[in-house]
Regions:
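Alpha-helical tetratricopeptide repeat
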Residues: 1-179
């Protein structure tokens, strides 16, 4: 078991450094040692998502979810993988499942809101961003995204207030200054 953890954590570290090939090799080693453990599948799925191997990422998230179906982030990551493959229906289903799994996780609402925003469903997007902010008042990405909704729906003063909030929360966010 210690070797499995060592391979897994080394893989996660390599993935964070952008060394995806070596990370994936370490995940293979960990999974070969203990294919019954769900964690390496999730972490390898994240690495594959970051490395734009979306179909393979979905396969890993499927394996993880079969063993651990109460982790909202797994559904969010699988939803993002589907979104990158332009399968908005499955992305939406996964974001909904993530929200049902953990109603206090702002990321599920933010991701679903982002999908609504992309589809110009502004009322639904705004409701999701509001809910994400209700879950975590410091979740700056939802303020930023809600400001985009306000801009798209001709509410510039509300957009400015949200962009100001993003700057207050993270003064290094250059996208806020650009928008």
């Amino acid at each position: 078991p210690v070797y499995t953890q060592a391979y897994t954590y080394r893989a996660i570290t390599r993935s964070r450094l952008g060394n995806y090939d070596d990370a994936l090799q370490d995940f293979r080693e960990a999974i070969d040692l203990r294919p019954d453990l769900p964690g390496p599948y999730y972490s390898r799925g994240v690495t594959r998502l970051l490395n734009q191997q979306f179909k393979e990422a979905i396969d890993d998230f499927d394996k993880f979810i079969r063993q651990e179906n109460k982790v909202a982030d797994a559904f969010i990551c699988r939803g993002l993988s589907y979104l990158h493959l332009k399968d908005t229906t499955r992305a939406y289903e996964n974001f909904n499942t993530a929200i049902r799994t953990n109603r206090e996780n702002p990321n599920g609402y933010n991701r679903r809101g982002g999908l609504h925003l992309q589809q110009e469903q502004y009322k639904e997007a705004e409701a999701d961003f509001n809910k994400a902010i209700e879950c975590d008042s410091a979740y700056l990405l939802s303020y930023f995204n809600r400001a985009l909704v306000y801009n798209a729906t001709n509410r510039p003063m509300q957009a400015l207030a949200d962009f100001d909030k993003v700057i207050q929360l993270d003064s290094t966010n250059s996208l806020t200054y650009f928008n």
